[in-house]
């Protein structure tokens, strides 16, 4: 099973550093203004990658400005999978969120140096991660990010990203919408849930050529009869 295991804020949303485990039933409590909505929106953005559908009021600062205000601002998502976790590093490039996939469990030493400062340049972060860990190219398209996460990865340029899918569905569009409605307390009717399940299924048409199986069965039957006849004749010959 694959799931979002941890979220890490580094100089993000007024948070100098925080690691939050998400690997179970998590209950967020606190008075108004302590950061519950801030955390939930960052989690939701992992699933829908849509800054216009995070429930941020128009009068508030944009997602990019609030969550990634500095060159050394990052949000890291650690995703658990069957063969070990990987990370999604979210950062700001040319004024908007971009991503890199890191094929290893999260380590704070990647981003925080010996002086307990968050690194700002990619070269030093890459050096801290090490050459043995596989790191993806930069993903700047939110549509491409959703395709990677939800398994719509049959294009040649996404072959290297297949191991990062949390589900495998080329028709996943209603899945992030459903998660979004849950996070934003929107209406979820039965028809929408049913449609989501149907569309998330693999709709590849599987054609079965019955003639092939019919011929194979016929050949097997003929061979079986020949062997049986040979054995019967051999037994008769021995008895004589």
Task: Put a short name on every predicted segment.
Residues 1-120:
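Extreme N-terminal "head/tail" segments of very large remodeling/mechanoenzyme assemblies
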Residues 27, 31, 181, 185, ...:
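Conserved aromatic-histidine-acidic binding/catalytic patches
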Residues 35, 185-189:
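Generic detector of ordered secondary-structure context
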Residues 63-67, 171, 175, 218-225:
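Amphipathic alpha-helical surface "interface" segments used
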Residues 85-186:
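Glycine-rich phosphate-binding loops of NTPases
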Residues 189, 194-225:
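Mid-to-C-terminal oligomerization/interaction "stalk" domains of large proteins
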Residues 226, 230-233:
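Interface faces of extended alpha-helical assemblies
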Residues 236-238:
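Conserved small/polar residues in nucleotide/adenosyl-binding loops
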């Amino acid at each position: 099973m694959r799931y979002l295991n941890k979220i890490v804020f580094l100089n993000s949303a007024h948070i100098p550093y925080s690691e939050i485990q998400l690997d179970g039933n998590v209950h967020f409590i606190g008075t108004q203004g302590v950061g519950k909505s801030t955390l939930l929106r960052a989690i939701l953005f992992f699933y829908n990658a849509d800054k216009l559908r995070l429930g941020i009021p128009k009068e508030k600062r944009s997602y990019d400005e609030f969550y990634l205000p500095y060159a050394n601002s990052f949000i890291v998502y650690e995703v658990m999978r069957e063969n070990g976790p990987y990370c999604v590093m979210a950062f700001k490039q040319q004024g908007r969120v971009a991503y890199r996939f890191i094929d290893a469990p999260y380590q704070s030493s990647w981003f925080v140096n010996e002086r307990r400062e968050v690194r700002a340049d990619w070269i030093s972060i890459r050096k801290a991660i090490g050459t043995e860990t596989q790191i993806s190219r930069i993903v700047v398209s939110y549509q491409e990010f959703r395709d990677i996460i939800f398994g719509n990865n049959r294009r040649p340029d996404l072959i290297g990203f297949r191991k990062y899918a949390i589900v495998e569905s080329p028709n996943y569009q209603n899945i992030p919408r459903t998660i979004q409605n849950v996070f934003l307390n929107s209406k979820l009717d039965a028809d929408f849930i049913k449609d989501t399940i149907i569309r998330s299924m693999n709709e590849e048409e599987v054609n079965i050529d019955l003639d092939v199986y019919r011929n194979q069965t016929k050949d097997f039957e003929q061979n079986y009869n020949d062997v049986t006849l040979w054995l019967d004749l051999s037994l008769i010959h021995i008895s004589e």
